[in-house]
Amino acid sequence: MIQKNWQELIKPNKVEFSSSGRTKATLVAEPLERGFGLTLGNALRRVLLSSLRGAAVTAVQIDGVLHEFSSIPGVREDVTDIVLNIKEIAIKMDGDDAKRMVVRKQGPGVVTAGDIQTVGDIEILNPHHVICTLDEGAEIRMEFTVNNGKGYVPADRNRAEDAPIGLIPVDSLYSPVKKVSYKVENTREGQVLDYDKLTMTIETDGSVSGEDAVAFAARILQDQLSVFVNFDEPQREAEEEAVTELAFNPALLKKVDELELSVRSANCLKNDNIVYIGDLIQKTEAEMLRTPNFGRKSLNEIKEVLASMGLHLGMEVPAWPPENIEDLAKRYEDQY
């Protein structure tokens, strides 16, 4: 069946986020099919860095300054350095319309992003960021234009044709995600040792959490990839009927070699042709102890494992074993 191409691929049953402050987060997702750690990690990283929207300064006007190659009396930095510092201001802004912010300060002292006067829907996320340093008697006034956008926009594209003299365009780095790294390691699921474990570290400017940034990036990928799906979802009526008619606990379809028993116990079950938990729980303690090389220690180990699943030896299972046991085991593997 067509749907087996995607339905039978393993999906992560563990997706965990841990945060370190407002700007850093770590994602761990496992298990993934072999190769999917690299595929998903690289795709998410590229989208995180390039496609999420954020706010940035697009232009600045400084009183008494005509162009960025000027210097300002009493200001230690030249205008070029001031513009570079302005590019690093982290901003969160609602809405799509351009907004303006103003800063005015007298020396001596340091002008920081926290000195900027903002309107209600603009938040400065790094208020301690230094813009420039004023000497005694110096004064500066700057007016910033702020926009929302995505990706990187160079200053020449922020230069309006009707811009007034003295309006200096600024390179805009809109992305709220500043750094993304990932690594892929092997992980275990049952007796399979070569599934992928994806670990991603995301650093943002604080306008969005790392967890939300990953969610937005995944949604972008989902939307972009959907155009390539040229068929309707196959009907699963027969499978759904089989699901509702199952006469026993789906956990009985799990194979005993996934119980992580000791080697001795596992070999004894294998030699006795006990494949599924449904086979095992129908055995009595006396029957198990008659198995070659199977002792009281192995019996107690198995009883403890079964008890953790709400099962025990000597149970009766109706309609066991089902004729299509292998197909049922695959169908229900996500439920146990």
Curated annotation (Swiss-Prot):
GO terms for cellular component: cytoplasm; DNA-directed RNA polymerase complex
Alpha N-terminal domain (alpha-NTD) as annotated region, ranges: 1-232
**What EC numbers are recorded for this enzyme?**
2.7.7.6
Q: Which reaction does it catalyse?
A: RNA(n) + a ribonucleoside 5'-triphosphate = RNA(n+1) + diphosphate
Sorted alphabetically, which Pfam families does this protein's record hold? Answer: RNA_pol_A_bac (PF01000), RNA_pol_A_CTD (PF03118), RNA_pol_L (PF01193)
GO terms (BP aspect): DNA-templated transcription
Gene3D superfamilies documented for this protein: 5' to 3' exonuclease, C-terminal subdomain, DNA-directed RNA polymerase, insert domain, RNA polymerase, RBP11-like subunit
Coiled-coil segments, which residues? none
Carries keyword Cell division?
no
Q: Name one GO molecular function term.
A: protein dimerization activity
Give the highest taxon in the source lineage. Bacteria
Is-annotated flag, keyword tRNA processing? no
Region annotated Alpha C-terminal domain (alpha-CTD), chain positions: 248-336
Quaternary data: Homodimer. The RNAP catalytic core consists of 2 alpha, 1 beta, 1 beta' and 1 omega subunit. When a sigma factor is associated with the core the holoenzyme is formed, which can initiate transcription.
- Domain commentary: The N-terminal domain is essential for RNAP assembly and basal transcription, whereas the C-terminal domain is involved in interaction with transcriptional regulators and with upstream promoter elements.
Q: What does this protein do?
A: DNA-dependent RNA polymerase catalyzes the transcription of DNA into RNA using the four ribonucleoside triphosphates as substrates.
| Family under the similarity heading | Belongs to the RNA polymerase alpha chain family.
Protein name as annotated: DNA-directed RNA polymerase subunit alpha
Tell me the organism. Allorhizobium ampelinum (strain ATCC BAA-846 / DSM 112012 / S4)
Supply the gene name. Answer: rpoA
